């Protein structure tokens, strides 16, 4: 986009100036549709999500066999939901605003196998591809015990095929670990933002890591081009994959089960707010789709992005989606939240979910560091900077009168609200790297 086009855009969408100044902001979505209308625009259904859940159940015996850390949950890749009352109290003191309701942390940061939310979508898509190949070759039937996949004959079969992906880090880690375990050849195309330890981990598993000096968008595009040259290569497209999206969506059904176990009520008088860090959009978009299916109108899904990389907010706010990048408005797309360092949002997710997502806000890197230090201090939970982005959500909701009025959220309803911050990564961060994060946060 040229300067004239951007100036015209700013006249129509004044919030762009706030984004250009790297200021923190909250924008609630005035274009929310009634739930059934909005869900229909996604072009995926609850049945699709249930089929994804069934596929994960078929693979559970195999996962339990090859990843001992999943045995306690019988091969289910799921994270804990924990109340963080001390963190809530600390945030209230920090913001001089009593945050009402109950604050919970969804610890996808500590998901088994790869320690991030990407263990949902990334691993699911690899499993779906492996199942398809094995069934087509007559090696597997749906009714089989999938633990049979842990044999040299299957690893030899899968080694004929390659899987490729472009990533800022965590998606590549999830796909690389799972693909290598099955026997696939794997190439992960990584952007300049990717942490060195993630590259080292992948290489230790025999994964081909291709590094780029550019950002996420270039890594994805180059990965896609390379995959097109090899008929035996399957490219996992983080920007457009409905399979990835469905892998994430299963989380909505799972959270509902956890709520039932903990007897957490969600209805018109007991609203649920879920705050999700957003990069390209597949993870939070898929999870939000699952949440809307599970909890209906009573769940509010709010995305959090770095002030340097607000690609989804920019795309949805202007209606341009993947036709505009943060670079077009002069932002540098450089952030400590490496998992969120994405300049151009997924057009598929933006268009599919634009009538379902309730709000978007941006957050400074300095604030992310403060939040990971506070979470460590109050709850002894360690996450990476991007995973803390959702922590400011309750404050924005409760201090935005227009949002509360739009959704008829009275003070009494907020007293009975449940707030879930979705922690997206950090479980596999080496201890010395985590200490660097915490030391840096104490200096600032």
Swiss-Prot record:
* Keyword Nucleotide-binding among UniProt keywords: no
GO BP term (any one): isoleucine biosynthetic process
| Pfam families for the chain | PALP
- Cofactor field: pyridoxal 5'-phosphate
MF terms per GO, please?
Answer: D-serine ammonia-lyase activity; hydro-lyase activity; pyridoxal phosphate binding
Record key words, sorted: Lyase, Pyridoxal phosphate
Q: Which residues carry this modification: N6-(pyridoxal phosphate)lysine?
A: 118
Q: What superkingdom heads the lineage?
A: Bacteria
EC code(s) of this entry: 4.3.1.18
Which reaction is recorded as catalysed by this protein? D-serine = pyruvate + NH4(+)
Q: Please tell me which top-level EC class this enzyme sits in.
A: lyase
- Is Lyase a UniProt keyword of this protein? yes
Q: Which InterPro entries match?
A: D_Ser_am_lyase, Ser/Thr_Dehydratase, Ser/Thr_deHydtase_PyrdxlP-BS, TrpB-like_PALP, TrpB-like_PALP_sf
State the HAMAP family in the record.
D_Ser_dehydrat
Query: What family does the database annotate?
Result: Belongs to the serine/threonine dehydratase family. DsdA subfamily.
User: What is the protein name stated in its UniProt record?
Assistant: Probable D-serine dehydratase
In its UniProt entry, the species of origin is given as Acinetobacter baumannii (strain ACICU)
Organism taxonomic ancestry: Bacteria, Pseudomonadati, Pseudomonadota, Gammaproteobacteria, Moraxellales
């Amino acid at each position: 986009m040229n300067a004239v086009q951007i100036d015209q855009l700013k006249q129509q969408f004044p919030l762009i100036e706030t984004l250009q100044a790297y200021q923190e902001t909250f924008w609630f979505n005035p274009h929310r549709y009634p739930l059934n209308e909005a869900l229909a625009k996604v072009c995926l259904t609850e049945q699709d999500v249930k089929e994804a859940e069934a596929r994960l159940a078929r693979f559970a015996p195999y996962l339990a066999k090859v990843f001992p850390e999943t045995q306690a949950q019988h091969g289910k890749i799921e994270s804990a939901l924990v109340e963080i009352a001390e963190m809530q109290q600390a945030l209230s003191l920090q913001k001089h605003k009593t945050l009402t309701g109950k604050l919970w942390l969804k610890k996808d940061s500590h998901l088994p196998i790869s320690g991030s939310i990407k263990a949902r979508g990334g691993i699911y898509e690899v499993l779906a591809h492996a199942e398809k190949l094995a069934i087509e070759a007559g090696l597997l039937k749906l009714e089989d015990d999938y633990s049979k996949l842990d044999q040299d004959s299957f690893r030899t079969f899968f080694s004929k095929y390659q899987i490729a992906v472009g990533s800022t880090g965590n998606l590549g880690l999830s796909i690389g670990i799972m693909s290598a375990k099955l026997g696939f050849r794997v190439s992960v195309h990584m952007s300049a933002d990717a942490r060195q330890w993630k590259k080292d981990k992948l290489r230790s598993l025999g994964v081909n890591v291709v590094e780029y000096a550019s950002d996420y968008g270039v890594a994805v595009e180059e990965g896609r081009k390379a995959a097109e040259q090899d008929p035996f290569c399957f490219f996992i497209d983080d920007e457009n994959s409905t399979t990835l999206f469905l892998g994430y969506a299963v989380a909505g059904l799972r959270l509902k089960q956890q709520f039932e176990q903990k007897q957490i009520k969600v209805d018109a008088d007991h609203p649920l707010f879920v705050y999700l860090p957003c990069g390209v959009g597949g993870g939070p978009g898929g999870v939000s789709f699952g949440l809307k299916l599970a909890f209906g109108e009573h769940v509010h899904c709010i995305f959090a992005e770095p002030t340097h990389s607000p690609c989804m907010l920019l795309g949805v706010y202007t209606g341009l989606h993947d036709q505009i990048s943060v670079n077009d408005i002069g932002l540098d797309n450089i952030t400590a939240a490496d998992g969120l360092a994405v300049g151009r949002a997924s057009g598929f997710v933006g268009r599919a979910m634009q009538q379902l997502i309730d709000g978007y806000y941006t957050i400074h890197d300095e604030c992310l560091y403060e939040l990971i230090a506070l979470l460590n201090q109050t709850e002894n939970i360690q996450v990476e900077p991007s995973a803390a982005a959702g922590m400011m959500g309750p404050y924005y909701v409760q201090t935005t009168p227009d949002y509360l009025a739009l959704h008829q959220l009275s003070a009494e309803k907020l007293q009975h609200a449940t707030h879930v911050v979705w922690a997206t990564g950090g479980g596999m961060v080496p201890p010395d790297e985590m200490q660097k994060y915490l030391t840096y946060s104490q200096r600032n």
